[in-house]
Amino acid sequence: LKLTMRQIAKLSKKYKIVITHGNGPQVGNLLLQQESCDAVPKMPLEIIGAMTQGQIGYMIESSLDTAFMELGENDQQHFVTLITYVVVDENDPGFQNPTKPIGPFYTEAEAEGLSYTLTKTDKGLRRVVASPKPLAIVEHREIKKLIEMDFIVICCGGGGIPVIRK
């Protein structure tokens, strides 16, 4: 991450930057943490998605801050992480056929008895969740404004948190 953020810090001198990221492993890990403890209320997937957007955004911001300090420009560049929603169609086939891999890889033996929807990968079996096609970014105006203000914007983590608007 540090090497990537150094390159992005250099690119930001000439370009406006928007950073997106995946969150599958982090979402899966948080789900595993929740499932391993009955004393703590379980959070729904959209809350876990928001948690990981913040978690990964923090990691990116921290690495960017270090990169800009190394370049001697720590007070000149601004960046922000934005928890981001995306509008999806309630009839999207992604709800019936989950395809987004999250969490760790399982062997056949480890997967036995799991109640998750799993898919085969080159590294083993992996849990999958719904990943409907994003139709629009809810915070598109805010993202545009932040870009116009020369912020590096970190948004749409994990593809965004899906919402249905009627």
Where are these regions (language model features)?
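Short, active-site-adjacent cap segments at secondary-structure transitions
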Residues: 24-28, 87-90, 161-163
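Short acidic, glycine/serine/threonine-rich loops at helix termini
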Residues: 29-33, 91-97, 165-166
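Ligand-binding beta-strand-loop-alpha-helix segment within the catalytic cores
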Residues: 37-153
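N-terminal glycine-/serine-/threonine-rich phosphate-binding loop
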Residues: 1-20, 30-35, 145-148
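Short beta-strand segments at enzyme active-site cores
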Residues: 16-29, 78-83, 153-156
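A short glycine/small-residue-enriched secondary-structure motif
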Residues: 23-43
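Conserved mixed alpha/beta catalytic, RNA-binding, or beta-rich assembly cores of soluble enzyme
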Residues: 136-137, 152-166
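N-terminal, well-ordered alpha-helical segments
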Residues: 6-9, 21, 25, 29, ...
